[in-house]
């Protein structure tokens, strides 16, 4: 299914974000998310040998700090023209827990961008809440 204009805009914003910073091992992925009120939030990962947040988690914090409410779609873009990256397992779980209705833009089996529900990416996620 083709992406909506909003979903395509997320790709553009995340791509612009990662391309605006110098190439670095410490900041190698950007993410953009759309809130239900139409705002777009961006962020980049922070790599550190002790662990660090993925770009998606940085965006979740940025959106929460801005009282964004529900996020409806998210995408991650790798630096050095790596393009769309699928959320890692930890990000999938956090997205499911905090925004169970969110879609993530990923590549389909033909390498084309598509937006899928987080439950499709993590159908049997751990349920920490009753």
From Swiss-Prot:
Q: Is Ribosomal protein among the key words of this record?
A: no
Ranges for domain CMP/dCMP-type deaminase come to 1-129
GO terms for biological process? cytidine deamination; response to antibiotic
The EC code for this enzyme is 3.5.4.23
Pfam families on file: dCMP_cyt_deam_1 (PF00383)
Q: Which residues form the active site?
A: 56 (proton donor)
Q: Which GO terms describe its molecular function?
A: blasticidin-S deaminase activity; cytidine deaminase activity; identical protein binding; zinc ion binding
Q: Among the entry's GO cellular component annotations, what is one?
A: cytosol
This protein's UniProt keywords: Antibiotic resistance, Hydrolase, Metal-binding, Zinc
List, separated by semicolons, the cofactors it needs. Answer: Zn(2+)
Question: Which parts of the sequence bind substrate?
Answer: 28, 82, 126
| SUPFAM superfamilies assigned to the protein according to its UniProt record, in alphabetical order | Cytidine deaminase-like
Q: What is this enzyme's catalytic activity, as reactions? A: blasticidin S + H2O + H(+) = deaminohydroxyblasticidin S + NH4(+)
Q: Where does Zn(2+) bind?
A: 54, 88, 91
Point out the coiled-coil segments of this chain.
none
Q: Which family does it belong to?
A: Belongs to the cytidine and deoxycytidylate deaminase family.
Q: What does this protein do?
A: Catalyzes the deamination of the cytosine moiety of the antibiotics blasticidin S, cytomycin and acetylblasticidin S.
Q: How does it assemble?
A: Homotetramer.
Read off the PANTHER family from this record.
CYTIDINE DEAMINASE
Supply the name of the protein. Blasticidin-S deaminase
